[in-house]
């Protein structure tokens, strides 16, 4: 977008229909507040299935998509925005859909030269009955984010996680099962500039309760972030380059965040996933990395909006 924020009507999408609704509401509020502080006209939209009608009536100049998870992050809302021909932020239909499918995105990234973990895709009921791979391993829904529905099966466990087979399970019939990689939890934010993707820095994340789950990500004090991460120089550099490679290989636009595990005993860096709609909450990793390189929260939100386009 070439016009200044003060001349723009920005619709901020938040909330939505997924299990990550509360995180999205917090992200959306932060972004909307930042835009209003820069004189933009802002419409805050708790996005539902009537979104197309709401946007048609509002006629915004641009949509800032702060939705997370199913429907808002998987290509569905992006398709609505493409159909309405409204400039919007973050990745387009294909990259969004691909990144939300962990199994398919791993195949694309592996082909591009990104080091990904082993394991595979399994029926959740089979995973609930037996160990499909030797412990320790991680079970995660194939199409969820924010560590929703993620379980760690520790070494020596006699039985797998039975919750995965329960009728109340709402995260899809197929789950990813991957070997647990000991060591450090790392992430890298990437900004897709005109000259190519630029990785910001590497954050080392230490959960206060031992496992980086939903609570550790979003609860105050749930994790400790160290940036830049204290890593061997070659590992730090590799994380930056692998994150940029993932951004490009997946066709991401705007901002993305890549997550890694680093086994510091075996000196092995393994890519976990790319997030096309990273959180923008007070404890989120991307705003933190942006601040480290001199970009304030307000600057980051402005850049994201200025990067909007249609088609993506």
Each language-model region and where it sits:
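Conserved metal-phosphate-binding beta-hairpin within the catalytic cores
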Residues: 179, 247-280, 290
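C-terminal active-site "lid" helix and adjoining low-complexity regulatory extension at the edge
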Residues: 268-312
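Hydrophobic beta-strand scaffold residues
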Residues: 42, 87-88, 116, 137, ...
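Phosphate-binding site of ATP-dependent enzymes
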Residues: 158-241, 269-270
């Amino acid at each position: 977008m070439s016009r200044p924020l003060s001349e723009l009507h920005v619709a901020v999408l938040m909330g939505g229909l997924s299990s990550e609704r509360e995180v999205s509401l917090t992200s959306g509020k932060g972004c909307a507040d930042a835009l209003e502080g820069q004189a933009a006209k802002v419409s805050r939209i708790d996005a539902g299935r009537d979104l197309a009608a709401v946007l048609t009536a509002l006629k915004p100049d641009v949509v800032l998509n702060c939705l997370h998870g199913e429907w808002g992050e998987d290509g569905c809302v992006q398709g609505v925005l493409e159909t309405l021909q409204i400039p919007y932020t973050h990745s387009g239909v294909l990259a969004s859909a691909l990144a939300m499918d962990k199994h398919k995105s791993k195949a694309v990234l592996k082909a591009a030269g990104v080091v990904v973990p082993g394991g595979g895709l399994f029926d959740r009921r089979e995973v609930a009955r037996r160990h499909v791979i030797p412990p320790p391993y991680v079970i995660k829904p194939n199409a969820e984010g924010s560590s929703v529905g993620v379980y760690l099966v520790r070494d020596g466990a006699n039985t797998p996680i039975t919750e995965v087979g329960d009728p109340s399970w709402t995260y899809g019939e197929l789950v990813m099962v991957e070997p647990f990689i000991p060591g450090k939890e790392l992430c890298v934010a990437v900004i897709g500039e005109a000259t190519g993707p630029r990785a910001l820095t590497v954050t080392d994340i230490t959960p206060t309760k031992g496992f980086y789950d939903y609570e550790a990500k979003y609860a105050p004090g749930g994790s400790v972030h160290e940036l830049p991460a204290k890593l061997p120089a070659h590992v730090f550099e590799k994380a930056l380059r692998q994150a940029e490679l993932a951004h490009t290989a997946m066709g991401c636009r705007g901002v993305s965040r890549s997550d890694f595990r680093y086994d510091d005993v075996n000196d092995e860096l393994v890519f976990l996933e790319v997030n096309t709609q990273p959180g923008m909450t007070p404890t989120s990793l991307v705003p933190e990395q942006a601040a480290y390189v001199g970009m304030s929260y307000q600057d980051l939100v402005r850049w994201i909006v200025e990067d909007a386009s249609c088609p993506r």
